[in-house]
Amino acid sequence: MKRLLSLLLLLSAMQSVAAVPAAADVPAAANNVPAAGRADAILAGVSDGFRALGAYGVSFEVRSDEYVTRGRYAVEGENYYLVLGDAEVYCDGAVRYEVDNRRREVTIDVVDTGSRNILNNPVHAFDFLGSEYAASLAGEQEGRAVVRLTPAPGNTSSAGNIVLTVDTAAMRPVSLRYDYDGEQVQVSVLGIKPLETPLKALSLI
């Protein structure tokens, strides 16, 4: 979460936007009984949908406190290219290169393959089955389901607790909310489509 927040705050300092209230969670079903089986089925539907696309692109909006930033990423296999504000991230599946175009700096880091943080490892941002998260259905109503994901004991994930809202008709994610030590980051998914062009390659020349 620290990496996600530091990147957000860096970008937000460059281009702050007037705050807009975060999207509310979908109201829970009347009985509000956790249903792990249904939650797992929804998670499977979402991850299967992304796998069926093969290479794909996602556009999104991030909200943290009074800041709002839009971004996008493209995935092909374990490789991805992500843009958020003036920053770009290139990843070859093993190493990620964070490029701050304004400061003309490049930070090189090893990929955290176990991360489910959309800004840290977008390849697996919606791949929760078999991960170190316990899933429960927080509510389902009018074609929207809310799945709560809690780190299992021993999971030191940087994403903390996660709330995933899903359009159950299309089995597509609508939003993610990360909650780590009281800090919240809301990510709204604006669009998902098959990738039409090759991933942008890193050039340091």
PLM-predicted stretches and their roles:
Residues 2, 15-68, 74, 78-79, ...:
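N-terminal leader/targeting segments and the immediate start of mature chains
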Residues 4-12:
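Sec-dependent N-terminal signal peptides
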Residues 62-64, 84-85, 99-102, 177-180:
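Beta-turn initiation residues at beta-strand->coil junctions
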Residues 70-119, 185:
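An acidic-aromatic
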Residues 70-72, 86-88, 134, 161-165, ...:
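Short, surface-exposed charged micro-motifs
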Residues 111-142:
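Flexible, surface-exposed loop/linker segments and immediately adjacent secondary-structure boundaries
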Residues 140-205:
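Gly/Pro-enriched, hydrophobic low-complexity segments
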